[in-house]
């Protein structure tokens, strides 16, 4: 019995110590967050954006542990606010060197153009565009100066799409894949039923790549103040050295990262200038008055709850019918909410969950709250269905 009470007291003491340590950990996190916010009032600053890190379409609630992940939506918001912030003198970017989703690259480019309307500079440094597609370059092509490390290559060559087909594999095990498909262009199931592209599948893939390529060429040529033909000629004869890319007008300065960073510091005002990570940037003051609610959904549409970036245990992202419908209900009940922006980035998924979200959009409209759709990386199948009933 004595041993039992000793063990019980030890357990209680251990739990007590755990909660004490957890309490001080939370205080520490709050203090660090406060210091990050305080840094924003420390004079002249340059926003720093590292596109080499994974960039989500949008993030969920801010996580308790760890830094908030970069996202396209937060980048656009931060740059739009920073252009009106007198303490922010410019933007310094480290370019992505591996590849980006085309829609994300285009939205980041548009956010940079919006930021530049303030007259503030944008400088980008790359450690080589080697083995990458067009998207990392297009994302930063609107920069005032594009730097590249002189010992690296410029190997951007265009776009490609690869599909693995498993048709015939199931038959070896006396299994037959069965899917419901609506017409020949609904080709998601082809990877399990075919051994190669069908004519319709090949046509849709080529059409998508051609459309993306032409759009990217037009945007890059506008940013670099060159003809589309001249820009295409460079990419069609890739790979190139950094020196040749500079001669072609696609790179402005050859140099290392530290030199580019110090150049940005001098341009902003000298040694006292600090670099502020864009994920730590928060505008000063509070917004009062009417509210526009933001509801986001990314990943496959599923029944039940969403899995988002705020959950440290989530292994993938999903757009849950219950979670999204509940968010709409909250916005409908909130008298301060005048309108709803619904960010959709999904390839589709559960018909039942898609219909649940479609109904939530309809209920918001019936309550007199306009619903505006912002499409992210994709809005296919059920993703387009949930958006179709919106006001715009």
Language-model regions, residue ranges each:
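Extended, domain-scale alpha-helical bundle/helix-rich regions
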Residues: 236-240
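Small-residue-centered hinge/linker elements
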Residues: 1-228, 233, 265-372, 378-392
């Amino acid at each position: 019995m004595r041993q039992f009470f000793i063990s019980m007291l030890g357990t209680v003491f251990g739990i007590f110590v755990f909660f004490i340590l957890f309490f001080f950990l939370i205080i520490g996190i709050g203090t660090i967050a406060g210091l990050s916010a305080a840094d924003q009032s420390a004079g002249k600053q340059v926003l720093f954006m590292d596109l080499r890190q994974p960039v989500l379409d949008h993030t969920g609630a801010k996580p308790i542990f760890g830094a908030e992940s970069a996202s396209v939506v937060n980048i656009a918001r931060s740059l739009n606010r920073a252009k009106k912030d007198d303490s922010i003198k410019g933007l310094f970017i480290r370019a992505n060197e591996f590849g980006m989703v085309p829609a994300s690259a285009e939205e980041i480019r548009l956010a940079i153009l919006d930021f530049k309307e303030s007259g503030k500079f944008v400088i980008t440094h790359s450690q080589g565009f080697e083995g990458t597609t067009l998207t990392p370059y297009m994302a930063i092509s609107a920069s005032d100066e594009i730097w590249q490390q002189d010992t690296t290559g410029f190997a951007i060559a265009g776009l490609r799409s690869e599909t693995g087909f498993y048709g015939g594999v199931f038959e070896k095990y006396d299994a037959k894949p069965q899917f419901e498909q609506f017409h020949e262009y609904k080709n998601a199931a082809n990877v399990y039923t075919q051994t190669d592209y069908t004519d319709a599948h090949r046509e849709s893939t080529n059409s998508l790549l051609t459309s993306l390529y032409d759009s990217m060429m037009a945007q890059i040529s506008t940013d670099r103040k060159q003809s589309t033909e001249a820009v295409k000629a460079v990419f069609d004869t890739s790979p190139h050295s950094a020196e040749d890319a500079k001669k072609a007008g696609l790179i402005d300065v050859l140099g290392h990262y530290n030199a580019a960073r110090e150049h940005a510091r001098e341009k902003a005002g000298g040694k006292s200038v600090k670099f502020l990570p864009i994920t730590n940037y928060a505008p000063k003051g509070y917004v009062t008055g009417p509210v526009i609610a933001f509801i986001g959904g990314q990943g496959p549409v599923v029944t039940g709850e969403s899995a988002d970036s705020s959950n440290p245990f989530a292994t993938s992202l999903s757009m849950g019918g219950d979670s999204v419908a509940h968010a709409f209900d909250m916005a409908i009940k909130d008298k301060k909410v005048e309108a709803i922006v619904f960010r959709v980035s999904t390839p589709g998924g559960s018909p039942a969950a898609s219909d649940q979200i479609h109904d939530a959009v309809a209920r918001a409209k019936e309550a007199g709250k306009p619903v505006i759709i912002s499409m992210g990386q994709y809005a296919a199948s059920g993703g387009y269905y949930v958006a179709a009933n919106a006001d715009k």
